[in-house]
């Protein structure tokens, strides 16, 4: 175990780390799980108001498990990566069924639940119990890859295995909760992706990337395939109430009805186009304004402009509607 690395990070965390985040007030595994899921691919400052609203509305596993999915999606709307919200709801239902409503802390139990991977399970257990658990989220990968210059000339699988081995060797036997938060905070606030603040880093003296001025070369970037694109023609209806129906791109949310090309071409008013990046897809959205049809499909729902501000709509659709109505 690299005790020196851990000791420096723990000391740094106590003095400079983020120690007053709302979820840190509790060691309840349900609370820490909710925070960890929200923090996936999302910045802390964005998560905080969503976390506060969720905990206020769903203070227990049972509250979230018994809530309608539409209400969960409505509270989540705007946070992105919507499969997280669906897994969130599904997860609490499983906890109710399999663990009698008591959120588990064993790694194997956590990893068996929807939306919880190996690193997330470790982060939850460490936060809830203070036990040493190696974690390897995106921030931690960046710290370790730079510190040990790990990844050059290796396959992604080889790199992942080495990073996990390094994470385990550096995890201390004591103060697991503080260390886990420290290594995540270091990656989020100091060892950042584009402009690392290496002069402020507590482990810069033995960071190989810092010593060779090669920080931005790590983690080694994967060769990515071109992002596929899809075109959506969407109808904006503005005679009175706004009409919505659920579509496949934002499952569980309300969005605008999709049109065929020939239907879109019949519109007299074309609205500004939008580009929106999903996880593995670029959507090119072409909205057009149309009168409400005489016969409204049963799957559609009418919203007022005020409802658009609060209902479960994808961020680009909400923004579009508030701009054009």
What residue spans do the PLM features occupy?
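Intrinsically disordered, low-complexity, charged terminal extensions of DNA damage-control enzymes
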Residues: 1-19, 24-25, 188-325
């Amino acid at each position: 175990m690299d005790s020196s690395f851990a000791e420096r990070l723990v000391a740094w965390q106590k003095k400079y780390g983020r120690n007053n985040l709302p979820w840190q007030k509790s060691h309840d595994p349900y609370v820490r799980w909710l925070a960890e899921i929200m923090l996936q691919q999302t910045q802390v400052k964005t998560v905080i108001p969503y976390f506060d609203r969720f905990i206020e509305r769903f203070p227990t596993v049972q509250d979230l498990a018994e809530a309608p999915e539409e209400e969960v999606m409505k509270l989540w709307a705007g946070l992105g990566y919507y499969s997280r919200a669906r897994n969130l709801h599904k997860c609490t239902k499983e906890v109710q069924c399999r663990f009698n409503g008591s959120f588990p802390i064993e790694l194997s139990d956590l990893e068996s639940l929807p939306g919880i991977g190996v690193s997330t399970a470790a982060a939850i257990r460490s936060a809830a119990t203070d036990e040493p658990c190696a974690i390897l989220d995106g921030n931690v990968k960046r710290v370790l890859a730079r510190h040990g210059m790990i990844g050059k000339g290796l396959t992604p699988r080889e790199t992942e295995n080495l990073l996990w081995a390094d994470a385990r060797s550096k995890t201390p036997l004591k103060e697991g909760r503080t260390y886990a938060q420290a290594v995540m905070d270091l990656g989020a606030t100091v060892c950042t992706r584009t402009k690392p603040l290496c002069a402020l880093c507590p482990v810069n003296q033995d960071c190989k990337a810092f010593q060779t001025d090669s920080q931005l070369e790590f983690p080694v970037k994967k060769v990515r395939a071109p992002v596929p694109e899809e075109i959506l023609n969407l109808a904006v209806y503005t005679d009175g109430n706004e009409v919505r129906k659920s579509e496949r791109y934002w499952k569980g949310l309300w969005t605008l009805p999709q049109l065929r090309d020939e239907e879109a071409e019949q519109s007299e008013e074309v609205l500004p186009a939008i580009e929106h990046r999903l996880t593995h897809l670029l959507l090119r959205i072409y909205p057009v304004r149309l009168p409400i049809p005489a016969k409204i499909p049963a799957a559609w729902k009418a919203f007022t402009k005020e409802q658009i501000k609060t209902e479960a709509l994808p961020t680009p659709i909400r923004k579009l509607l508030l701009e054009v109505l």
